[in-house]
Amino acid sequence: MDDRLEKIAKVNYWNGNRFDSGVERTWYLDRIIPYTGNRVIKVVTGQRRAGKSWLMRQVMASMLKNGVMDPSQILYVNKEFYRFSFLHTTDDLMDLYETYCREINPDKKSYVFFDEVHNIPGWERVIDSLSQDPSIDCEVFLTGSNSKMLSGELSTLLSGRYIEFEVQPFSYREYLRTVHSSPSRSTMLDYLQSGGLPEFINLRGEETKRHYVESVKDTILLRDIVERYNIKDAALLNSIFAYLVNNGTSLVSVSNVVNYLNNEQSRRNPKAKEKNYETVSNYIGYLTDAFVILKADRYDLKGKEILKGAAKFYANDNSYHNYLFDGFGFGQGALLESYVYQAVRRAGWKVYVGRVQNKEVDFVCTDHDNRLYVQSSWTIEDEETAEREYSALESIDDSYPKIVVTMDDIARKNRNGILNIQAWNLEDYLVKLSARYNIIQG
C-alpha cells in the first residue's frame, strides 16, 4: 500500500475500523441525509469544537448502516491531523484521491469527506473538479470553521451546487441526552451554566473547564482569525471579543466599541495610538465569520425592514460568559436571553431585535412569510415586569405567535393569545412550531 494511504488508514474505514461518533445529532442528520446520493456538495460549517467532525462521522455511520456504501468507498481527510501533514498543495490532494481510487476503491463511487481542507491554497478547484468532472464518480462533504469559505472562488465555481448546514454547540435537548436527564428547571440552570460545547460537558472540575473554554477561545481567535487574516494586534481582537460577549443584551455599535477601547487605553497609556473605526469593524466581522459571535440586527416592525447601525451580539455558547469573564456582571437574565437567541436561531429562524411603539421586543423571528415574536425574562412573577413584557407583544398588530420565555416554576395563563413558555420547554415548542410552518431546523 502507498505510504500515504498507510498513514491515514487508521482514521479511515478500509480495514474494518469503527469509530465512536458521539451523541447522535438527529436534527442535523435528518437534514443532511436526504441530500445524499447526488453531486450536490454538502458543506458543514460552524465554530470550532461545536461537533462538526463528530457529525461527519455520524453521516458516514448512517450511510454505512443503511447500505448506501461499503467501507472502501469512504475517503476521510482531516487537515487538522498530523498524519495528513503531507498535504500542502492541490496537486497533493488530487494525487491522494487518485491513489486511493487506484489502490482502495477502483470500481465504485467514492464518498470523500474533507475536514478543514480549506487550509490548502486553491482547494476550491479540487472540490469543483471532484464534484463536477463527469469522469469522476464522487460525492463530496466538507467542513469549515469560517462562513467565508463559501464566498469568493468556491462560490463562483460551484454557483449554487452546494448546500450549507451550520452546526451549533449542543442544544438543551442534546445536552439532556448527554447527561441522561430530563427537562426541568434544575437541568436548565445547569445548561445555562455549562453551555453546549460537546467535549466540555463531560469535564470535571471548574479549573479544568475554565482551561478548556480558554483553549477553545484561543484556538478560534488565533488560528481561525489571526492567522487567516494576518492580524497584527491579537490583543485588540481579544478585547473586542470580551466586550461583545459581556454586552450581549445591549445594543452595540462599532462606535461604542471604539470609544470603550480608547477610553480603557487612555487610562493605561495616554500616549498610545487610538483604535480606528475600520479596524474594529473588520475585527467584529472576523469574529462573526468564525461563528464565535452571533449578530442580531435591529428590525423595524413598522417599516418592516432591517436597520443598519447598532445591533446585539451574542456569544455562540454560554460557557464563554461563565468561565472567561468572572469580573463582568453578566446576570441570570442575560444568560437566559443568550440561550433563547441561540435556541430560536438553531430552530431555523432568522432572528432580529425589534421595537414597537418605543417598547423593546427581544426577538423578531422570520422565515419567509412566517413570524414569531419572543420576549425573554428570568421571571414575570411581579406585575410590573409582566406588564412590560406582555405589553410590548400586545402592541404588535398581527396574529403571528407571540411568547414570553421565563424560568418561573409556574407558567402564567395565556394573555391575549400570548403564551408563557418555561425555558426548559422552549425547544419542544419550537419543534412543533417549525413542523407547523415547515421550517428546516439547524
Write out the residue ranges for each language-model feature.
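Short glycine-rich substrate-engagement loop in P-loop NTPases that contacts/grips substrate
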Residues: 76-107
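Interdomain motor-coupling "hinge/lid" segment immediately C-terminal to the ATP-binding subdomain
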Residues: 2-8, 145-147, 151-251, 255
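Hydrophobic anchor at the beta1->P-loop junction of P-loop NTPases
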Residues: 44
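A short, basic N-terminal segment
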Residues: 1-38, 285, 442
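Accessory nucleic acid-recognition modules appended to NTPase machines
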Residues: 73, 205-370
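Conserved catalytic/switch belt of AAA+ P-loop NTPases
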Residues: 124-141
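Walker A/P-loop
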Residues: 53
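Domain-level recognition of nuclease-like catalytic cores that cleave nucleotide substrates
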Residues: 409-442
